[in-house]
């Protein structure tokens, strides 16, 4: 992100994409009972991790990890990173970090007493659903079990 908050989710389109793709709203509209879902976003996740483990993320991993959305359901941690892009930029390379972040969140899940962790990307289709990504980067992510979705999650497939 650029100093002063002009990149990432601080852009108008980035914030709009995050609101448009809100997980809790999508689950509610799809008729899911949210009783057994525990939701958190960005800065809430390190606090949840510390509450469940007594450990600070930055002490274990050198920094806090701030997922766009995370949910615990059925003894599993689901981390959803959302990327919206209107033109070329650093987000092109950010999705390549998925395998590293998956390993971090799997360790978080283990320490939180959860059975597993999944790392998912929710990408804006108008930018990412093109051969540049679908022929190279997305198959690479899939090798690690990282699922990618365009514009909306397939809730039935995930939950």
Residue ranges and their predicted role:
Residues 38, 124-125, 151-154:
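Acidic carboxylate-rich catalytic motifs and surrounding loops in phosphoryl-/glycosyl-chemistry enzymes
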Residues 34-36, 116, 148:
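Residue-level detector of short coil/turn "hinge" positions at structural boundaries
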